[in-house]
UniProtKB/Swiss-Prot annotation:
It comes from Pseudomonas putida (strain W619). GO terms for molecular function: ATP binding; four-way junction DNA binding; four-way junction helicase activity. Belongs to the RuvA family. Residues 144-153 are annotated as: Flexible linker. Coiled coil: none annotated. One of its GO terms (cellular component) is cytoplasm. This is Holliday junction branch migration complex subunit RuvA.
Length: 205
């Protein structure tokens, strides 16, 4: 089992990364909440990982915090929730927001995540409620993402990457394009910031 990786961030193509560890490139898929916190390509990065072994592939998922990985593991234990849906849930909602939804049995935010209808949201909340009783939503447990922009050059490429990342989460291409286009003052923003603002707009609308 690979539990953690520390190396050089070699590539970043949301929602995938490649981390170079002593000459070996590990490809990972990460939730957008982890992507927002990553350093620039070429810098050192540490991620906590979860390995999924399948007949045709070994898939590695990465997380900025251990407790994000714990949340991911809780989600994929549920019936009908695979890694893709778990990442979509964690990308659309901050970890503490998701825990609060479970504790309050609030489906309003969950149903805006691709692949989650009302019945599915209700079932997930019921199944997770007992598991999350001991979880507290506090800054000590989750490091929240800043609302500040992350500027970068090459806005057109950043926008294309943002749309591609949203589609990979399950949003329709038209929905993804519309969400990115709706962002005001987006010139110079990084793909990560465009994704963050797009998801925030779609989940909270």
């Amino acid at each position: 089992m690979i539990g953690r990786l520390r190396g050089t961030l070699a590539e970043k193509q949301p929602p995938h990364l490649i981390i170079d560890v002593n000459g070996v490139g590990y490809e990972l898929e990460v939730p957008m909440t982890t992507l927002y916190r990553l350093p620039k390509v070429g810098e050192t990065v540490t991620v906590h990982t979860h390995l999924v072994v399948r007949e045709d592939a070994h898939l590695l998922y990465g997380f900025h915090e251990k407790r994000e990985r714990e949340l991911f593991r809780e989600l994929i234990r549920l019936n009908g929730v695979g890694p893709k849906l778990a990442l979509a849930l964690m990308s659309g909602l901050e970890a503490d927001e998701l825990v609060r939804c479970v504790q309050a049995q609030d489906t309003s935010a969950l149903v805006r995540v691709p692949g989650v209808g009302k019945k599915t949201a209700e079932r997930l909340l019921v199944e997770l409620k007992d598991r999350f009783k001991a979880w507290e939503t506090s800054p000590a447990m989750f490091t929240l993402v800043s609302d500040g922009p992350v500027p970068v050059s090459g806005a057109s490429t950043a926008e294309a990457d943002a749309v591609s990342a949203l589609v990979s989460l399950g949003y329709k291409p038209q929905e993804a394009s519309k969400a990115v286009s709706a962002i005001k003052d987006k010139a110079g923003l990084s793909s990560e910031e465009l994704i963050r603002r797009s998801l925030k707009g779609m989940i909270t609308k």
